[in-house]
Each structure stands twice: as C-alpha cells, then as structure tokens.
Design a protein with these regions (language model features):
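Cytochrome P450
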Residues: 1-414
C-alpha cells in the first residue's frame, strides 16, 4: 500500500504501520516505500534528517501535491521554493517575525486570553475555537489590520479551516478549500490596499511592511500575508493539547501559574510540541544519489521526514512515550532531534514561526494554569490530521473560580 493511503487510514501512526507492513524493524532509521506512486525513502536517523535538510541534496518545489500545498500555503508561496528565491523571500518574512517584533504580539495574545478567561467561571468552554478567536484577534491587531471583533473572528476562522482541512478529512477538506478561495480573494484586495496606504494602521505595521517587501503581485503578497497570520492561529491545536496535558498534572499547573516560571512553561510547551506535532511527516525530493543507513537513495526519489518517529525515537529521548516536560529543563534539543515543525538550521527550511509558537504557548500556559478546570472528554482520534480532543476539548470551569491568570495581577500588565 502506498504511504499516502496509509496516511489517510492511519494518520499519525502511518509511518509505523508502513514500517511494519514492509517488515522493517521498529527501530530502523531509514526504509524504502512508495509515496503518491513514486519511490520514496523514509528517514528518521540523524544522517537521514541531515540529508533531508541539505539544500544541495533535496528540494521542495512540486513535491507536495497542489491539492494540499495550495490549500495550506497558497499558490506561489515560500514553502514550495528553493535556493536563492527561497532565501530572499524567507528573509522578508523572518524580518517581520523578528524577536523584537514578537513581544507585542505575545502581549496581545495574553491580553485576549485573560479577557476570555474572565468569562469562563460557571461555564463549559470548548478550548480550541476559543483559542482560534483569541489568537486570531491578537495576530490581526498586531499586524496592523484594523478589524472589529466580528470581522477578526471571521478571518481567524477562515484561516484555521485551511489548517483543519490539510489531512483530506472529508468535509473539513471541502471547508478548507472554500476558506482558501475566500482568503485569496480577500487578501489580494487587502494587499493592494496596504501597498497603496488605503488599509491598516500605518506603513510601519507588520502587514504593510510584509506586502511591500514581497517582490510579486498582489495575489502572491496576499498569500504570504496569510502565511504570516495563519501560523499564530494554528498554534491553537498545540494550545488545546497543552490544556489537556495541564489538566492531568496538578503539580505542573501550580508551578506554571507562577509568573516567574517562564523557563518551566517553555519546557512544558516544548514537550507539547514533541508529543503532539501538527503532521506526522514532511516531504522533499532527492536531487542527488546517496546511501543512508544502507538504503539507496536515487535522484528523484521522494524523501519522507518521519516527524512522529524522530520525536518519539528511543535513541533520542528517554521514555519517549511519556510526557516529561522536565527533559527540556535538563538539555536543549539539537537541530535534528526535535522536529515537530521541521528541523535543520534557521537559514534553511526550518519553520520561521518556531519561536513564535513557543512564546504563544508560554503565554497560553500561564493563563490556563491560573484557571481551575476539568476535562469533559479527553478522547483523541489519531487517524485524523490535524487532530484535537473530541469537541475541541470541552472544559468545565466551576462557578466562582478565578477567571484571570497570574499575569493579570502583575505590575505593569494590561
């Protein structure tokens, strides 16, 4: 069976199922298979991951079929580029997501979450859509897009539906494409207005700076604007799993509520990323032959990065199937050991939003840790990509519970 069919059937366990079907030992670092009809090599060992991220050995353009690539990233986006054009476009986008620029965005996330949490006592709350709204309002405001709350919620929902549909999950895939077409129309006009100074809060706002820096037409600039906004909203999947994990770990909840425990919150966020990545695999194409762990790679073969296998590899992680945030307090992972959003070095194809993801999760954990709640149904369907606990994780917050995080009472907080 083609690995693409196993992904549809088994979801996050697809590569493990493929390995078993080919009679490959569970601890094998590399094995050959087929992906969308092409010979493919699945890589998990460090030599394999290094080859996957070597720009002289692998390329991305045209590897992910347009029905998926264009849904999630948009036609003509950075994610399908290679070489100098990729580096130039990425520099423009990383500049907008610089460390100095992330502080105001994370502050907006914390403020939106504090305001939402104040309404939770005495209610049942579905965490995932709540985070989509909070993160969406935060990133749209930070970007300098002057939208009222209803419009911001609509844009956030449309961007989240693109993420929700990438796993070919039936109706979610259809909704995802409807939202992709909606966004491309909306964002093309928005990019033109931003470039002309007819929209936004000013020429120095992130959205305006980005569309001016993209050397392409308004449609492509709008696509890349979505690729700056959508990743923040996509953190809602990880934020939902952070809420699920926190409910089971009262000692960690107490610790993470302390405003001074930022490093502990970062460690918890890293463990959430390790155990619940967005996707089980990434794909590329080999541009030169090689032999990896005894498996021959031919020019033109597909390369499949086994994200789930790497992030749960016993050779890299002690007790890999246990949730242990403290592992990230003890040592920092290498560039090829923790790959929930891809690996390698920042100048290459490593996700430029990785730092943003961690900081948004850290702010989310600080709010969640300050609110007592119980989980109604923790069941998770691992065959669906991307996945959340059932119902987006419904939590019950008792009446009279504190509805704001420790941040809300700290000096200088908004």
């Amino acid at each position: 069976m083609d690995l693409s069919l196993r992904l549809l059937r088994h979801g996050y366990d697809a590569v493990a199922a493929d390995r078993a079907a080919h009679g490959v030992p569970p601890d094998a670092g590399t094995h050959a298979t087929r992906l969308v009809g092409h010979r493919a090599v699945v890589v998990r060992s460090e030599p394999g991951v290094r080859f996957f991220y070597d720009e002289s050995a692998a390329e991305r353009k045209g590897v992910v079929p347009p029905p998926l690539a264009w849904l999630l990233f948009g036609r003509g986006a950075l994610h399908g580029m290679d070489g100098e054009p990729h580096r130039d476009r990425k520099r423009a986008m990383v500049d907008v997501l610089s460390a100095d620029g992330l502080g105001p965005l994370v502050g907006r996330v914390a403020q939106e979450l504090d305001e939402a949490a104040a309404t939770w006592p005495g209610r049942e709350v579905s965490v995932h859509p709540t985070l989509v709204s909070a993160y969406g309002r935060a990133v749209l405001g930070w970007a300098g897009l002057d939208l009222d709350d209803d419009r911001a919620d609509t844009v956030a929902r449309r961007l989240s539906q693109q993420v929700d549909g990438f796993g070919f999950a039936g109706p979610a895939y259809v909704r995802g494409w409807a939202s992709r077409l909606w966004w491309d129309r909306y964002a093309t006009g928005l990019a033109a207005d931003l470039r002309a100074g007819r929209a936004g809060t000013g020429a120095d706002a992130p959205a305006a700076r980005l569309v001016r820096s993209i050397d392409a037409d308004d449609r492509t600039a709008g696509v890349e604007l979505g690729n700056i906004l959508r990743p923040t909203i996509a953190v809602s999947w990880l934020g939902t799993f952070a809420a699920l994990r926190l409910a089971d770990l009262p000692a960690w909840r107490e610790r993470l509520a302390d405003p001074g425990e930022e490093l502990a919150r970062m460690a918890f966020a890293q463990e959430v990323r390790r155990t619940t990545p967005f996707a089980p695999v990434l794909a590329a194409r080999a541009t030169r032959p090689a032999t990896i762990d005894g498996v021959r790679v031919r020019r033109g073969d597909r390369l499949v990065l086994d994200i789930m296998g790497i992030d749960h590899d016993p050779a890299r992680w002690e007790a890999p199937h246990e949730f242990r945030p403290e592992r990230f307090l003890e040592h920092a992972p290498g560039a090829f050991d923790l790959v929930p959003q891809g690996g390698g070095h920042p100048a290459g194809h490593r996700c430029p939003g990785e730092s943003l993801t961690l900081r948004v999760l850290e702010a989310t954990l600080r709010v969640l840790a300050g609110v007592p709640y119980e989980v109604a149904d923790p069941a998770v369907d691992l065959t669906r990509m991307p996945t959340t606990p059932r119902g987006g994780l419904v939590i019950r917050v008792p009446a009279g519970a504190p509805g704001r995080s420790a941040r809300a009472s700290t000096p200088g907080s908004a």
